[in-house]
């Protein structure tokens, strides 16, 4: 299926790119979410005339995502969960729970591509706020607040040993 992208899509293309994708991906993902339109001659003419507006809209999205990134980049989010003695969680922490705890405004749709976190400790997670804007956050999973502080101290000590900047909890 040939489509014209009207929003940038990670690992697929930018605005105005004509892409050939699987029928299911186009019908079930790109078209319903308004990331693309069918590549017909009429649609190509329409997109060429509105490319300026699309680029401005894309730039506004990038600016909003960068503003959010400034707030959350390299921040810590602490989850207090029940764990077994060997540090395995009873359950897991999913991307949906992380996004909910980030409390990002509804204008920005954050995307986190991770497997559920099932162990205690500090985990690094990449957050995509826009196709072109990404940041890293740290998930601190512990049984109690004191254990979370211990993990943070160990993490900061490890960073000092590698000559990186010391991170402090932003929550």
From Swiss-Prot:
It comes from the Bacteria. It holds the Pfam family Ribosomal_L9_N. GO terms for cellular component: ribonucleoprotein complex; ribosome. Keywords: Ribonucleoprotein, Ribosomal protein, RNA-binding, rRNA-binding. GO terms for biological process: translation. The keyword Ribonucleoprotein applies. One of its GO terms (molecular function) is rRNA binding. Binds to the 23S rRNA. PANTHER family: 50S RIBOSOMAL PROTEIN L9. Belongs to the bacterial ribosomal protein bL9 family. NCBIfam families: L9. This is Large ribosomal subunit protein bL9. It comes from Orientia tsutsugamushi (strain Ikeda) (Rickettsia tsutsugamushi).
């Amino acid at each position: 299926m040939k489509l014209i992208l009207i929003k940038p899509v990670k690992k697929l293309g930018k605005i105005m790119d004509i892409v050939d994708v699987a029928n299911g991906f186009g019908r079930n993902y790109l078209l319903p979410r308004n990331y693309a339109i069918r590549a017909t001659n009429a649609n190509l003419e329409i997109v060429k005339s509105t490319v300026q507006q699309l680029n401005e809209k894309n730039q506004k999205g990038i600016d909003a995502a960068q503003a959010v990134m400034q707030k959350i980049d390299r921040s810590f989010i602490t989850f207090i969960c029940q764990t077994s003695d060997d540090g395995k969680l009873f359950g897991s922490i999913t991307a949906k729970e992380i996004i909910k705890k980030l409390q990002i405004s509804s204008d920005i749709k954050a995307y986190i591509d991770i497997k559920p976190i099932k162990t205690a400790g500090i985990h690094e997670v990449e957050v995509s706020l826009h196709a072109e804007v990404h940041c890293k956050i740290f998930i601190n999973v512990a049984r109690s607040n004191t254990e979370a502080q211990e993990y943070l101290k160990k993490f900061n000590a490890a960073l000092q040993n590698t000559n990186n900047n010391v991170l402090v909890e932003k929550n």
